[in-house]
Amino acid sequence: MYGLLKSALFGLPPETTHEITTSALRVAQRVGAHRAYAKQFTVTDPRLSVDAFGQTFPNPVGMAAGFDKNAEIPRALAGLGFGHIEVGAVTAERQPGNDRPRLFRLPDDNALVNRMGFNNEGADTVGARLDAEPLPDVPVGVNIGKSKTTPLADAPDDYTYTFSRVGDAVDYVVVNVSSPNTPGLRELQGRDQLAAILEALQDAGASPLLVKLSPDLHQDAVADAVELANDLGLDGIVATNTTTERPESLSHPHAGEQGGLSGAPIRERATEQVRFVAERTDQPVVGVGGVATAEDAYEKIRAGASVVQLYTALVYEGPWVAKRINEGLVSLLERDGFDSVEDAVGADL
């Protein structure tokens, strides 16, 4: 069924398709239809449950940040069977983002390229929505980024302001210093700059607090960031974000578009970083990048991820993707003799 709908949707510009999808989910959430379709999409099995950074996840498959930037449809997304939802990225200031077109499909590669630029309604508006709207029963996190116009030196105050507006209603906070689409943002992954941001947020009461790292960091820089996270007692690390690098295997003309690449081509690289991070910390790792099948999710779990997230796979696989992954994970756990997902975390380390 999704194949027919996908053909129609893929005939439209990617961002138009996203807006149509979001509008449909918004209506479903408003009228309560998400509660009905949740019965079709949700896999309920205690073996899938994971406890990480103070939260209980009914299953390890989450919706990554970027899909619901303004926290408009978390209940509708949870109804698709996801075990957690991460909204955002949210910035202190309202931002239009970069000029369109800024989202591109690479269908032969099951990939996307985006240069959205943290387009969102701003912390005041998103925070008010989070405070006013009921949230789903699964954990909801918020991804926060730096406003484009804020100088790098003022980043700690910028992030802290955003947290003060959006942090109370959610279950965890992710500091995004790794998007390639805000000028200079990745410079904040340096130890001193990152420490200033994280310490300011901790002083403001942000907890659980995680940091999201880039797959393009040199291993020494990743090791430094993990060491800092350990020293500060962060609650977890998200590995990874999109990459600006392009594998030679990409065949679509849009592969040359500026922006971050996500989807199948970054799966192995993301898993390598999950493993690298997990070997250096006792804190939970969130694995992101190229998760589209149960095998993809299981690979990251065995490499050290407590939970995983996806976005691009929802575009290509449709609304059943979380259900298929969770059903497949149960089969993989049974095959390998694990009693639960938690037992499989880090099995390959």
From Swiss-Prot:
It comes from the Archaea. It holds the Pfam family DHO_dh. Binds 1 FMN per subunit. It catalyses: (S)-dihydroorotate + a quinone = orotate + a quinol. NCBIfam families: PRK05286.1-2 (NF003645), PRK05286.2-5 (NF003652), pyrD_sub2 (TIGR01036). One of its GO terms (molecular function) is dihydroorotate dehydrogenase activity. The gene is pyrD. Catalyzes the conversion of dihydroorotate to orotate with quinone as electron acceptor. FMN binds at A65, G66, F67, D68, K69, A89, N143, N176, K212, T240, G263, G290, Y311, T312. Residues 245-255 have a biased composition (Basic and acidic residues). GO terms for biological process: 'de novo' pyrimidine nucleobase biosynthetic process; 'de novo' UMP biosynthetic process; pyrimidine ribonucleotide biosynthetic process. GO terms for cellular component: cytoplasm; plasma membrane. Gene3D superfamilies: Aldolase class I (3.20.20.70). This is Dihydroorotate dehydrogenase (quinone). Residues 244-265 are annotated as: Disordered. It is an enzyme of class 1 (oxidoreductase). It is found in: Cell membrane. Its EC number is 1.3.5.2. Belongs to the dihydroorotate dehydrogenase family. Type 2 subfamily. Its main location: membrane. Its cofactor is FMN. Disulfide bonds: none annotated. Pathway: Pyrimidine metabolism; UMP biosynthesis via de novo pathway; orotate from (S)-dihydroorotate (quinone route): step 1/1. Substrate binds at K69, N114, R115, M116, G117, F118, N176, N181, N241, T242.
